[in-house]
Amino acid sequence: MEIDFVRLTGSIAYATLFIVAAGWDAWTRKIPNWTVAALAVLFLFAQLLTWSTPNWLSSFSAFGLVMLAGVPMFARRLIGAGDVKLLAVAALFAGMENLLLLLVATAIAGGALALVALAARPYAGVFGGWIRTRAGIPYGVAIAAGALHVGTTTGMLAISQRLTHLQL
């Protein structure tokens, strides 16, 4: 088993950036633009280095579809702008092939997060009123969970390659 260090570095960067965005969103309810920009740059490097990402057309189609649906939702204040941008950059990595998987995994994680938030409300005093004073849930956490699920399920985060030689 050979370890592909470029893939290993990319996988660590992918996971780290999504985890940082999720943590930042959980703490401040804002997703920093630099995390989204860094993920977009990572996607470009992944494409150039032939990492396990979908082709350009598939990736940008998924990105465009998420933006097309997300911008009106942001305009109606149903979702934050950072959430739309983070989901769109996650869609770049997922491509059209795995966009449904990304959206379903994100929705399931969001539902679980909402249940945890509801269950934690009676204990708001323990958290210094943090739960009660903040409306909604930090959906960046759910988006990051969905993106990490897609990364592990599709093999995008695999750090080794098994080389098979066929003799005909």
Where are these regions (language model features)?
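A membrane-topology feature that recognizes alpha-helical transmembrane segments
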Residues: 1-79, 84-168
